[in-house]
Regions:
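Extended aliphatic helical segments
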Residues: 24, 35, 83-86, 103
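Conserved short "hinge" loops at termini or chain/domain junctions
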Residues: 1-74, 108, 112-129
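Short conserved catalytic/interaction loops centered on acidic-Pro-aromatic/His motifs
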Residues: 97-108
Length: 129
């Protein structure tokens, strides 16, 4: 999913009526909140752990994070993990709306994806030498 699709998916997961966003620039109101939540969630996820080189896309690392700016920007992680960004964003968005059932759902889904991300992209610990 690209940046725009992630923001649209977040809106659906939040059970928000209406349409949009239709792009990620020049947004106001709720659409701006969804766009911002996705951008911030992706930056947070990149900074959560000391991910290994397989996690990072070309030219990106813990010191040079990928910022989503254009509608077509796509997070560098494999496609099957893109929805993790939505669930991470959903937690804070649901908190701001005092929607406890959505907070719980966001946390449960994010926990599943965090486990998968850690299993696949954290350096393997070693003992001794």
């Amino acid at each position: 999913m690209n940046y725009l699709q992630l923001a649209q998916r977040l809106r659906r997961e939040m059970n928000d009526t209406g349409e949009g966003p239709h792009n990620v620039t020049n947004q106001t109101g709720r659409n701006l909140e969804y766009v911002d939540a996705i951008r911030e969630a992706w930056l947070d996820i990149q900074s959560l752990r000391p991910w290994n080189k397989r996690f990072c896309g070309n030219g990106f690392d813990g010191d040079n994070l990928q910022e989503l700016e254009a509608s077509s920007d796509t997070p560098f992680i494999p496609k099957q993990f893109h929805v993790a960004i939505v669930y991470y964003a959903m937690q804070s968005k649901a908190l701001s709306q005092n929607a406890q059932e959505l907070v719980m759902r966001g946390q449960n889904e994010w926990d599943k994806y965090l486990h998968l991300l850690c299993e696949r992209f954290l350096p393997t610990p070693s003992l001794g030498k």
